[in-house]
């Protein structure tokens, strides 16, 4: 599947191009978040009904792996919250697949991007990634008191390639605060919490286990 989305030129021919060939045709973390919440929902559903085959966990992990590093990191939360012993063979098979790719194909541009934290860990650099380092060093800052209260009313800058987001930040929290202040950010959290709770009420008898774990995943 190709993509009809118009994206910045830097994504075409880059190591992130593999993420364009998905149903959502997106090269950004939203694709990881979609598959992550799908995995979380299926694990929660299976915890209640115990009807889904364990091999589905392996396939979901493989699908999520090609969507981005957000899935790779946060899927651990879902697995720990809804762990079943019968998932162990699928988890071991997935771990072996990841280690084999990271060990034998670290120079492959797609593997290098998707499994960067694992590759760094195998080479003694710790479980880190360039995107996390960039976020911590270049995109996080403390807004002024005025920005917290009144905000700047800006979300995008109008640039097409670099610096598209106001404040040149890649942090979702800061983007909301700069746009509408801390009150607006709290409203966004409240709306997210409302929909997560509605899903829990409709599917999982209002399970706070699902509500809190899903909200933690979405908050990150």
Where are these regions (language model features)?
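Hydrophobic transmembrane helix bundles of membrane-integrated enzymes that assemble
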Residues: 1-116, 164-220
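Long extracytoplasmic/lumenal interhelical loops at the membrane interface
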Residues: 110-113, 119-180
């Amino acid at each position: 599947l190709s993509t009809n989305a118009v994206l910045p030129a830097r994504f075409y021919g880059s190591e992130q191009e593999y993420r364009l060939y998905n149903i959502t045709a997106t090269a950004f973390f939203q694709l990881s978040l979609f598959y992550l919440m799908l995995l979380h929902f299926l694990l929660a559903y299976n915890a209640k009904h115990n009807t889904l085959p364990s091999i589905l966990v392996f396939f979901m992990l493989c699908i999520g792996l090609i969507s981005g590093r957000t899935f790779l990191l946060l899927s651990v939360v879902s697995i720990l919250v809804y762990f079943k012993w019968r998932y162990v063979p699928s988890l071991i098979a997935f771990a072996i697949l990841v280690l084999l790719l990271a060990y034998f194909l670290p120079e492959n541009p797609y593997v290098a991007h998707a499994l960067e934290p694992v590759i760094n860990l195998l080479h003694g650099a710790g479980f880190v990634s360039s995107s996390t380092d960039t976020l911590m060093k270049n995109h996080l800052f403390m807004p002024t008191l005025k920005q917290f209260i009144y905000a700047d009313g800006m979300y995008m800058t109008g640039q097409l390639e670099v610096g598209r987001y106001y404040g040149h930040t890649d942090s979702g929290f800061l983007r909301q605060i700069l746009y509408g202040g801390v009150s607006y950010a709290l409203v966004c959290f409240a709306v997210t919490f409302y929909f997560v709770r509605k899903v829990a009420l409709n599917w999982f008898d209002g399970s706070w286990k699902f509500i809190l774990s899903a909200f933690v995943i979405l908050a990150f």
